[in-house]
């Protein structure tokens, strides 16, 4: 997939694998990987860190004027290290924590990334910040428990029919 950026937009962040030597070009191993990889294009607020040679991106898109990205990235790094301590290793080539700054919160795990939503005060009040971090940590842990160790119904998907998962309570409960 090649992305052509409008001149005012400077960044593309996605869990997809970049194609070496080809700017703004990404590849997916299969259709499931493609549709499981959110893409943020624009001028987001980003911070990065590396653990075990693996790039981690902490990104906020939207009204980021009140977001403390340095604080968030430092705490996300602690979450990654804690999860690594529990699970033994990091099972992905790189990871993207993509957060849309909106009015409500929530999130969804992806194989090599997280797409979440949070309010603009997420890093300004203790309660909002703990809510943001706990959702992010929960969805990040799904990288092991749900994306790699999963009920058979969770992949590969049947895109022609609804997919019902009778054991999702186990995956969510263990997380």
Summary of predicted features, one role per range:
Residues 83, 170-175:
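An active-site-proximal "capping" alpha-helix that borders the catalytic cofactor pocket
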Residues 18, 159-161, 172:
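Generic structural "secondary-structure junction" signal
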Residues 1-52, 57:
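Intrinsically disordered, low-complexity linkers and stems that provide flexible hinges
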Residues 1, 138, 175:
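Terminal peptide-recognition signature
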Residues 45-167:
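Juxtacatalytic substrate-recognition/specificity segment
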């Amino acid at each position: 997939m090649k992305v052509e950026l409008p001149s005012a937009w400077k960044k593309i962040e996605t869990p997809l694998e970049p194609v070496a030597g080809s700017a703004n070009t990404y590849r997916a191993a299969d259709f499931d990987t493609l549709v499981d990889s959110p893409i943020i294009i624009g001028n987001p607020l980003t911070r990065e860190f590396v653990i075990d040679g693996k790039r981690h991106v902490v990104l906020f898109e939207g009204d980021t004027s009140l977001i403390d990205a340095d604080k968030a990235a430092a705490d996300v790094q602690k979450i990654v290290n804690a999860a690594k301590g529990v699970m033994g290793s990091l099972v992905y080539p790189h990871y993207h924590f993509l957060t849309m700054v909106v009015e409500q919160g929530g999130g969804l795990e992806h194989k090599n990334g997280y797409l979440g939503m949070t309010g603009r005060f997420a890093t300004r009040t203790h309660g909002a910040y703990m809510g943001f971090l706990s959702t992010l940590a929960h969805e990040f842990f799904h990288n092991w428990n749900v994306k790699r160790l999963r009920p058979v119904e969770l992949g590969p998907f049947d895109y022609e029919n609804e997919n019902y998962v009778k054991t999702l309570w186990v995956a969510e409960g263990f997380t």
